[in-house]
UniProtKB/Swiss-Prot annotation:
This protein's record includes keyword Lipid metabolism: no
Domain of life (superkingdom): Eukaryota
Localization, UniProt: Mitochondrion outer membrane
UniProt source species: Bos taurus
Lineage start: Eukaryota, Metazoa, Chordata, Craniata, Vertebrata
Name the record gives this protein: Mitochondrial import receptor subunit TOM40 homolog
Biased composition (Pro residues): 11-36
Amino acid sequence: MGNVLAASSPPAGPPPPPAPPLVGLPPPPPSPPGFTLPPLGGGLGAGAGTGRGSERTPGTAAASAGGTADDGACGCLPNPGTFEECHRKCKELFPIQMEGVKLTVNKGLSNHFQVNHTVALSTIGESNYHFGVTYVGTKQLSPTEAFPVLVGDMDNSGSLNAQVIHQLGPGLRSKMAIQTQQSKFVNWQVDGEYRGSDFTAAVTLGNPDVLVGSGILVAHYLQSITPCLALGGELVYHRRPGEEGAVMSLAGKYTLNNWLATVTLGQAGMHATYYHKASDQLQVGVEFEASTRMQDTSVSFGYQLDLPKANLLFKGSVDSNWIVGATLEKKLPPLPLTLALGAFLNHRKNKFQCGFGLTIG
């Protein structure tokens, strides 16, 4: 979707280094104590609606079994979650590539307001500084969820990423995101999502320009067929002067107590993931991607090892391109410090990359 957003923007002269797609905005800073930021891609949390089916996720056998029994007793199916979250459970197991040195300082100014400072030093790209702000409103829907949520991030060149998320009513959530590159307005999009008892529907409008006649429209729908099976689809329509097109994809998700299988099939190719929770400490995932445009396929294996007593989180991965990577996160109580180490090795290109990070607060 990010590529289509970029394609729908009107051509311009040679700008500074291209900004990342709007959909791939950097993750927001951690929320203030006592609150949890909602998923930026949608997905309603607890307390969003009354009498609605609860979303079923793998890894909670007792809760899932109880929820399934209740749904069956009242003739209701569980909510399938959002289309954008179909592959997220597996992707979260894979380590994020690190390079250089990164220092992050988080400071909570109140229960609703937090700021953070990030300095990144790189040997490959440009070093940069980011200032981030997070505000969580007073409309509390659950002990860990409140609205509206405002997240902003600005770097040393003046480029801004900002998002506003708000719960408009039971089951209805909206989001607005903007992106600037120095003094130029690059991207903006508006999302609307409705979560029913057994389905989720979402619409995204990106970079609309009535005068030029360009823009992008994305529609998602996911429906529970059985307590374990959900089916849905995605329609992407983009238009700009001299070009117009639409791409459709179908998706299926099968969920059991401790594993989740998802497949997405469309004109661009195929994407399949498998997530398995082996124990409270170990989770594994397999990802398969096939691109019709690139005529290429790849398979990746990732795992996550969580040792709460040691305050340790380890992630590792290996793929069919012989790229091996790992990250290690270690909390250092009683100090509010988190140490992160990462390394990636590409055997085919004989390239090695490593990084070090420290988070305070």
